[in-house]
């Protein structure tokens, strides 16, 4: 009714279109393609996504929805007036329940969406060509079918074990809180500072207060390092509570037929993704599954299991960030890095040990400084991470930069490039832009777009956040490497369950397959020094250290 065509005829026509070898242009392709696949319809031809293109053209936008991009690039928005009016009359949600409306109310809206997507693609093709982004767009486009398969494959979870573990942890939490109540008489609410304060008051223990309101304040670090056994009970109860309410409940909620099919955010968008090109996950966020807690981390990760007859294989790029630093310093012909480069070429080197020997400082301090500088960490944060006084930290920084000069030289080189050009380009051609400006003099100021910054601060301005340029170069290049390796694996029919940080988690049938995966990942992108992939396997994710 309502002018709708017969469903079977529409499906047949749509199926024929999808089976053709013509290019298919989408906006937010993951949503549409997953729906098409769930209908059992085969989709042939190259799939291009204008949302991915828009993110490569400008990763710093606030919104990537079709309407916003349409206005900005085509001066035309979505046609929603008739749709919203009809939905109001019918008493339904115009987006969630659009399928309930007759075609005559939806047609114009749908046609405008198609017009905007096609128009946007024409604009994006020129933008990407002008900015030399075609090669990185090709990588993202070629990878897309792999990510669709990855989402449909999902990851198996032991649901029965999850329920048992939740009960076990809830009981442990209950016992810890009963111990606190027994000694103090306080029925403590572990996430309420005022409630925790009552326990401290009963025990005559000191605690911090907020500066403005003088309310009790309890940080995670304060509680976890406190010597009193009852405070340790509260700290442990909080960790256990978070484990079963945040992580295990999430696994149980999102499980479907024994699998989790998370949303994979390929690139920066309205629903997730990152400005550097790294993946993110949602519904649930698999990258938040804990690893650092030596007791709870393995327990929760043990709920993730491989395909039947397989082992859980973890393939981790070894020291990916340090290797990229050595690669870029070598490209700049910095002679102070040549010794480090030779160590990698001759043997399986450890960057942090090499730097520790160069600077004559302990390895743990060398590693903290290395990673802090790579991640664009400020001096105050780095000092806190080192756990030393300000004077000692300054002494360490001076020694480090004198004896390991290539790191600071590279930092300055990349930062200057960002300041002069307003952008840097990653290993495989991704652009990271620095679009905000601040006053040239040091101080705390809000970074603003160029026009607003000129008006607010005058002519003496500079690009903001260029001190993070090395971090963006490394993170973006690491994303390039990981995506290229996933594409090369996909060409051999290998699809990962999870991509988290520098690792890919894959079901592995035997050592031959594991060896082949290592080879593909190590050779996917060529650096000035060899890549190395560490491999571990176990019955589940939790058995991997």
Identify the meaning behind each predicted range.
Residues 1, 321-358, 442-462:
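Metal-dependent catalytic core segments for phosphate chemistry
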Residues 1, 44, 61, 71-74, ...:
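Conserved "right-hand" nucleotidyltransferase catalytic core of DNA-directed polymerases
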Residues 1-68, 72, 292-297, 326-328, ...:
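Conserved RNase H-like, two-metal-ion catalytic cores of nucleic-acid enzymes
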Residues 14-18, 296-311, 489-491:
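A short acidic-Thr-Gly-centered motif at the start of a beta-strand
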Residues 152, 205-208, 224, 357-495, ...:
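Conserved catalytic core of nucleic-acid polymerases
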Residues 385, 505-509:
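Short hydrophobic/aromatic beta-strand micro-patches
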Residues 390, 509-513:
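Helix N-cap motif at beta-to-alpha junctions
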Residues 404, 519-529:
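A common structural junction motif
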């Amino acid at each position: 009714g309502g002018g709708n065509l017969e469903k079977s005829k529409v499906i047949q026509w749509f199926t024929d279109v999808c089976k053709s070898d013509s290019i298919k242009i989408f906006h937010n392709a993951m949503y549409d393609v997953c729906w098409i696949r769930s209908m059992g319809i085969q989709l042939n031809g190259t799939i291009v996504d204008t949302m991915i293109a828009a993110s490569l053209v400008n990763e710093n936008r606030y919104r990537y929805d079709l309407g916003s991009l349409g206005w900005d690039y085509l001066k035309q928005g979505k046609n929603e007036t008739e749709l919203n009016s009809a939905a109001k009359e019918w008493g339904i949600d115009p987006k969630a329940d659009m399928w309930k409306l007759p075609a005559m109310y939806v047609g114009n809206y749908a046609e405008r969406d198609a017009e905007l997507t096609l128009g946007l693609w024409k604009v994006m093709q020129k933008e990407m060509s002008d900015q030399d982004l075609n090669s990185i767009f090709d990588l993202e486009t070629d990878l897309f079918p792999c990510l669709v398969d990855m989402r449909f494959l999902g990851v198996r979870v032991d649901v029965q074990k999850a329920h048992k573990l939740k009960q076990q942890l809830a009981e442990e939490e209950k016992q810890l809180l009963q111990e606190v109540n027994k000694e103090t008489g306080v029925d403590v609410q572990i996430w309420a500072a005022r409630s925790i304060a009552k326990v401290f008051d009963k025990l005559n223990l000191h605690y911090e207060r907020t500066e403005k309101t003088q309310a009790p304040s309890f940080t995670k670090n304060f509680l976890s390092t406190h010597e009193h056994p009852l405070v340790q009970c509260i700290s442990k109860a909080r960790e256990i509570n978070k484990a079963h309410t945040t992580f295990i409940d999430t696994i149980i909620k999102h499980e479907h037929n024994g699998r989790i099919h998370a949303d994979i955010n390929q690139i920066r968008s309205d629903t997730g993704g990152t400005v550097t090109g790294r993946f993110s996950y949602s519904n649930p966020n698999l990258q938040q599954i804990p690893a650092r807690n030596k007791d709870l981390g393995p327990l929760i990760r043990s709920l993730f299991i491989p395909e039947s007859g397989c082992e859980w294989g973890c393939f981790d790029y070894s020291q990916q960030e340090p290797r990229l630093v050595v690669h870029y310093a070598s490209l700049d012909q910095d002679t102070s890095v040549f010794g480090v480069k030779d160590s990698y070429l001759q043997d399986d080197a450890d960057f942090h040990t090499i730097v520790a020997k160069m600077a004559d400082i302990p390895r743990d301090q060398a590693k903290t400084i290395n990673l802090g500088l790579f991640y664009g960490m400020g001096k105050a944060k780095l000092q806190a991470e080192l756990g030393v006084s300000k004077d000692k930290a300054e002494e360490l920084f001076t020694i480090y930069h004198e004896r390991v000069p290539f790191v600071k030289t590279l930092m300055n080189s990349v930062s200057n490039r960002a300041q002069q050009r307003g952008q840097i380009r990653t290993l495989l051609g991704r652009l990271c832009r620095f679009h905000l400006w601040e006053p040239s003099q040091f101080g705390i100021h809000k970074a603003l777009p160029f026009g607003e910054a000129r008006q607010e601060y005058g002519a003496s301005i500079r690009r903001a956040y260029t001190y993070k340029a090395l971090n963006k170069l490394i993170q973006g290049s690491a994303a390039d490497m990981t995506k290229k390796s996933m594409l090369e694996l996909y060409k051999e029919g290998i699809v990962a369950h999870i991509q988290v940080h520098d690792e890919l988690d894959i079901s592995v049938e035997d050592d031959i397959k594991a060896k082949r995966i290592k080879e593909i990942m190590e050779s996917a992108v060529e650096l000035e020094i060899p890549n190395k992939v560490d491999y571990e396997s176990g019955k589940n994710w939790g058995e991997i250290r």
